[in-house]
């Protein structure tokens, strides 16, 4: 009996499954009673429960008289991947998966249990020997400081060999295209795939269980769609996939995709990741710095584009100008423009400043779009939310991609990670952070001169400290960033916050449950710093907040109706922010006027105070 103890072994939750099996004359053994400690598990399996289940599964696989009943519950994130690994390990040996929820009927469990037991008995009687698969997939190996690619026929290539190509799925158009351009500048044959569409989603769903999170389904669909559209390819194709060390399911994407490649027997195809373990794919310091610059510029340019969509007199002409600037930046990252980045950005600012505006960018309403990093940035995953808000006069500030890189630095420097670093590594990482901050400040300072971008440095520490009373910083992941950013930005720059995440994403649901309670004046006040102007908003009660999950399908009409109500509430808050701002500006002006009047008329205290400050 496999599964999580709280729903597999608890009689109130398991629908009497152990009793149903035992009453038919079969022994039921909980998996944690098996002596399976000596089995090895994949190093990528970072969930403790997953390690125990996979070890016990190997024990069951070796015993002819043991069969697996896997009890899970609806929308269990880790099980969406563990079930795939479990079935792959069992191979042709039958097993039964029972997914329980509040609608599960007793009769349905009886029927499936009887059918499974009949199949298992037949399997034992037939004594089926599984066929041996002779497929050999390509793979990426780390040879010291060099990355090598081994094709399906055993030939070895370097990463820069013309016979090797790296394909990047769309993870936000600007970010993906810029990273691909930087890889090409290194001599690597890199290609950025276009933004996913409905066909991509369907391809992904056909080759997954559809229970995995949306980013994995879309990226898998993108890869398989590319392979099927290029049947005559003669290169080893490496599919770039982000990874992590848990608890988020992101760290399982690469292993699950490798299983898809093996199952579909796709020759000369492998998964490529960049981590500190493989020296970031052999990228040198200069290319890593370029990647950081590209991510910062991508984040800023997305904000500028949204501002112009609301403020420009001619929206189409303005967005065309942004597109031309972006193509020049891509040429720079590819190494085809021999000009300094600061000069190129200054030229871009001059062109952006010349765009005619019908509204003052500093007075337009701003909505913060936060949540899971892939979904909030990917144009297909978030559907038409950004366009809908812009058409209603709202600038949409999407939480930056660079924020998560800064969070990774924070985790390392705060000692929240499991790995221990040597003194030299710590010094090197501190230098890297200082260089990153210098370039972030430099790029944002230049782009803010256009008047279309508001300068603000990423401060992850401030975000986390502000919500330390809600989430412990040891609970790593995007939940703490989502909660912190929502409460920081509301009433500061934003008149409303939208949190978006994949369907069934645990960090997104944790953040949503907290924000639904805390997105009010009392919650904002609990995280506010001294000197905040929260007293001007006390009559607002609840603050505009809207959370939604996406599975790639079009949003239902109920979501659209809720968005309309959210927009009305956000517009009222924006008007209150403008009133407070105008009142503050006039009060400051009066204070300055009186101050100078005192100085001119010879007021002794005022004059002595000025002399003291001058000294």
Where are these regions (language model features)?
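An N-terminal assembly and electron-transfer interface module characteristic of large anaerobic redox
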Residues: 1-615
